[in-house]
Design a protein with these regions (language model features):
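Surface "functional belts" at beta-alpha junctions
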Residues: 1-90, 104, 118
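Acyltransferase
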Residues: 83-135
Length: 135
């Protein structure tokens, strides 16, 4: 959410580099006062994301370090603009803007209610399991 809040396009796709030839992706639409998630976050290849992007009729802003890493996959798609390198990572400014918009709507969350979203197991956990299972 933090990366895409800074942009003014109506439809935004966030593609963060997930390593292993994959991207962490999420789709958003800009709405008055903030952004609206169109699709939940997932893990996919750049080719899978490109195929999904082609199903939309609107112009799309593609942001994130994964979008830049696999730019050659997306450059041939019509209606897709890649955000520049300086905007590839979340910014504190965008986080404050999102938090302010929620605070104005009195949408408060207690710190202990925040939960991270894990789309897959971390490499270290997978490597540990693989190493222990091979013994």
């Amino acid at each position: 959410n933090l990366i895409i809040f800074s942009f003014f396009a109506l439809f935004i796709v966030s593609g963060m580099d997930a390593r292993r030839g994959e991207l962490f992706t999420a789709l958003f639409r800009r709405v008055p006062g903030g952004i609206q998630r169109v699709r939940d976050a997932n893990v996919c290849t750049a080719e899978d994301l490109a195929a999904e992007i082609q199903t939309f009729d609107e112009s799309i802003l593609l942001v994130g370090d994964g979008a830049l890493r696999y730019a050659e996959v997306f450059e041939s798609l019509g209606r897709v603009e890649l955000a520049e390198q300086g905007l590839a990572h979340p910014s504190a400014r965008a986080m404050v803007q999102l938090a302010h918009a929620r605070a104005m709507r009195e949408e408060f969350v207690q710190p202990w209610d925040l939960e991270p979203i894990y789309l897959r197991k971390p490499d270290a956990e997978i490597n540990w399991s693989t190493r222990n299972n091979s013994k």
